[in-house]
């Protein structure tokens, strides 16, 4: 479902920004085109040159860059993509999204779009648990923003708890669930697996203990149909 799709990847200014490099690779493996946008803080953790080299696309950074605006204005940039992914989504960026603040290119893009948005929060556990952040989460969910994570684990600061950015593979999976719009959308399928028992008479049966990969294959194949 990613072939021919255009992903606008907004990279926030957090230590988890390094994961965005792997995220770009994962999207490309699926056939997607990744157009990167970096906040000023993101450039402190990963270089725009690295992001441009991996994505094979220009990195957009500045709202008031005349060259960027002449090539593709921020309005068109926000609307020419099939999905906007914010990873990492810092507490600051989430707060801007919740209250409609458009103070830089990233936040302006997010305010000027009607494209589906998926965010992957990443911050210190205390920042994530703070009432202000939790209120922002509620606002964003109410506004239709999709979430991937955060996950629980060790922090770069040495603390433990929720606030780790989801792994790139998990973000790609969440993105695929948003993009698919197949004929079985909103339909539920029950997939069973394990050994089978087939009776041959009232007292005997044939048992197959081997579990093939078929159930897993069926589970993966149902995704393009949105079931």
Feature-to-residue mapping (PLM):
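Short, acidic/small-residue loops that bind anionic groups at enzyme active sites
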Residues: 97-124
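Glycine/threonine-rich flexible loop motifs
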Residues: 91-102, 127-130, 200-207
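Short internal beta-strands
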Residues: 33-41, 119-121
